[in-house]
A protein has these predicted regions:
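Residues that scaffold the ATP/ADP-binding catalytic core of kinase and kinase-like folds
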Residues: 29, 58, 81-82, 86, ...
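Flexible mid-to-C-terminal extensions adjoining Fe-S/redox cofactors in radical SAM and related proteins
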Residues: 209-285
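Conserved, mostly hydrophobic/aromatic
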Residues: 21, 48, 73, 203, ...
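Structural motif
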Residues: 22, 49-51, 113, 274-277
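Radical SAM enzyme [4Fe-4S]-AdoMet core and its adjacent flexible, acidic
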Residues: 66, 74-76, 81-194, 201-202, ...
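Alpha-helix N-cap/loop-to-helix initiation residues
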Residues: 28, 56, 92, 118-122, ...
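Conserved alpha-helical substructure of the radical SAM core
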Residues: 1-69
Length: 285
């Protein structure tokens, strides 16, 4: 916890004010309450990712009383059978819907988080999800399927320009958004390093939760050095109008090749900085 306290203090120097606690399922961590206290909800917005299985009225009130700000509940489909099959857990859909009610009762902010695969944005099921979110006044946050991790080898899941264009069209009509949605008068851009950084349990900093490559370890180096390193990387520093891990096939190949090479040595990810991002060019100074 001392490492997280130092991270919280370092984040203040950068004006970082949000921490999203994810997993696995973070609610299974017996030290979650201590972690929330350490990250300091009086200074930072504490957001919780959950599949909803354990997020009932009691847990929602507990999180709100701890100073929690928002809960993001994952829902893969409005069709209960499809959602439960994907989660490999009968009843998962019902538990997710219960979680939304619990969060609302506790006065928490909410998001419905869902993944878009190719062509889903044109389906009746997706229309039903947008209607549900509108009726319940829940913002719909969408992530594009990435050909990495469990999606590796499933290039057919990756959204095309046609999908992305339709999504942008719907953003103007519904309360739906992605990390690429224009905001505060700025056009949508990839937010690696600039708007998001992922910290794992060992202190490794990844520039995106969908990347398995590290920029450095915050328990061994200052956060400022790691973020500066990321901003100077040719893939991560410059602003891009694409999701680099979801749309840029040159980077996707580089990423997956390095992950495969590292996995031949050890099953433990992420790929260390020296074996991955350090091998790419820097932004010209």
């Amino acid at each position: 916890l001392s490492d997280y306290k130092k991270l919280s203090e370092d984040a203040d120097e950068y004006g970082i004010f949000r921490f999203v606690i994810t997993g696995g399922e973070a609610l299974l961590d017996r030290k979650l309450g201590d972690l929330i206290d350490t990250l300091d909800p009086y200074k930072h917005l504490i957001i919780l990712d959950s599949n909803g299985w354990f997020f009932d009225d009691e847990k929602a009130k507990w999180f709100a009383d701890k100073g929690g700000y928002k809960v993001q509940i994952s829902l893969d489909s409005m069709n209960p059978a499809d959602h439960d099959a994907f989660r490999r857990k009968p009843g998962a859909h019902a538990k997710a819907l219960r979680a939304f009610k619990a969060a609302k009762k506790a006065g928490l902010q909410m998001l419905l988080s869902s993944c878009l695969i190719k062509d889903r944005v044109f389906t009746e099921e997706f229309e039903e999800m947008m209607a549900f979110c509108a009726e319940e006044e829940i913002p719909l946050y969408l992530t594009l399927a990435k050909p990495v991790g469990s999606g590796k080898g499933h290039d057919e899941w990756v959204c095309t320009k046609k999908d992305v264009d339709q999504l942008k069209f719907l953003e103007d009509k519904h309360q739906i958004f992605t990390h690429m949605t224009p905001s505060y008068g700025h056009p949508g851009k990839c937010i690696t390093v600039k708007g998001i950084n992922t910290v794992n349990h060992d202190g490794e900093i990844m520039p995106c939760p969908f990347m398995d490559m590290s920029l450095g370890n915050v328990t061994k180096e200052p956060l400022s050095l790691i973020l500066d390193r990321g901003m100077k990387n040719k893939w991560l520093g410059p602003y891009r109008d694409e999701c680099i891990i979801g749309e840029n096939w040159e980077f996707i190949k580089f990423h997956n090749d390095k992950v495969n090479e590292w996995s031949e040595e050890t099953p433990y990810l992420p790929v260390p900085y020296e074996k991955g991002f350090a091998l790419t060019d820097k932004v010209p100074e």
